[in-house]
Amino acid sequence: MFDLPTVAPIDMEDSWVTFQAEGEQGQDSFSSSVNLDDSLTSLQWLQEFSILNANVGKAPSSGDSHGYKHLFGAPCSPLAADPACLGMPHTPGKPISSSTSRASHLGLQPMEDIDYKTNPHVKPPYSYATLICMAMQASKKTKITLSAIYKWITDNFCYFRHADPTWQNSIRHNLSLNKCFIKVPREKDEPGKGGFWKIDPQYADRLMNGAMKKRRLPPVQIHPAFASAQAAASGNSNRGSPWQLSVNSESHQLLKEFEEATGEQGWNALGEHGWNAISDGKSHKRKQPLPKRMFKAPRLSSSPMLCQEEQTELGSLKGDFDWEVIFDSSMNGVNFSAFEDLEVTPPLSPVTRSVDLTVHGKHIDCPQQWYPLGQDQAVVQNSLDFDETFLATSFLQHPWEENRNDYLSNSANIEQLFDLNEEFPAELNDWSALGSYI
């Protein structure tokens, strides 16, 4: 086991007596300090404070309730002695800035009575551009150096002799950026270094009158061509509706040439029905919706699916045509009046390889576009439309021979068609008795 340190009873008694003595002495000093230093937390000075006795230069009264002896220039309140409170107003209301408090001992003076040559505390109420202009005019020369401008400013204004030399940077910036000043290069025969500066004659009067205190950017100049185009665009936008399409004269002329060039190929239909030109004197066109298609447009002979020979053979089908006139002219008087009640419908399936495409004894191979394998819907529709026209043409060029036997009679007879294995009764030979079986 560890041995615990033991303290002698005599030492403990001595330390306890010493502690009690120190405690009694501290209590006495604390009570005395409370009685003496009670003024540190007292606000009685705030009640006695007034504006009349707040003057620093006023001599303090001999009688003091707290027994303090005021010296000349001593603060009239405990807070005034704090370094953080220096420069702050002693009374609420009007705050005092640091710049005005430094010159408060000089008193308030009018601006006309201030001598800027001898007063180092007041900054001249002039801009840097005005100071430069004053220095140039005082020199009685057409051009002046930068060092001469510095010298004239420091000679006539004491403030700049004692101020921070950063004001010289402001002078250089004004000379470089302000358009009222022009830099004149030094001649080769002139002694010294650096260039000269002078006032632009067109801005001299305005600068002296105080109109050019601040450097202003010149107004943005717009080219006359862009200005006229912008004005025309704004005028058109005000007159036209948001859905109105504006077309200039050049585009209008190109559109006319395009319609004339494509008129022979049938594009004139689009020009007549797709666009309705509504002229208001300014070459405007408004797009109108296409009218509802009530009839099927005739097939054009310039279809890309027909070769040159087929287009020659289909010459009679160009434009609008009448079936009866074509039938009468092609068949030389053959009566096809029954076709008036015939409704021509497109075939249910595309043309296959077995279709006879012989025209005037010449065989034409079926184009690859007619095959149904691997075709999209648009190609199938085009082939259906072409089949209708081509079959009608082939029928007109070589009609079926009259001595041709019926297709139904060649393929099957009556007995095979109705599957009749027995002979008809004798009484069925009489056609009059056939009605009883029906």
Swiss-Prot record:
Cellular localisation: Nucleus
Main location: nucleus
MF GO annotations: DNA-binding transcription factor activity; sequence-specific DNA binding
Pfam family, one: Forkhead
A GO cellular component annotation in the UniProt record: nucleus
Positions of the DNA-binding region: 123-217
GO biological process, one term: ciliary basal body organization
Coiled-coil residue spans: none
Protein name: Forkhead box protein J1
Originating organism: Xenopus tropicalis
Domain of life: Eukaryota
UniProtKB keywords: Activator, Cilium biogenesis/degradation, DNA-binding, Nucleus, Transcription, Transcription regulation
Role this protein plays: Key transcription factor required for motile ciliogenesis. Activates genes essential for motile cilia formation and function.
Similarity-based family: Belongs to the FOXJ1 family.
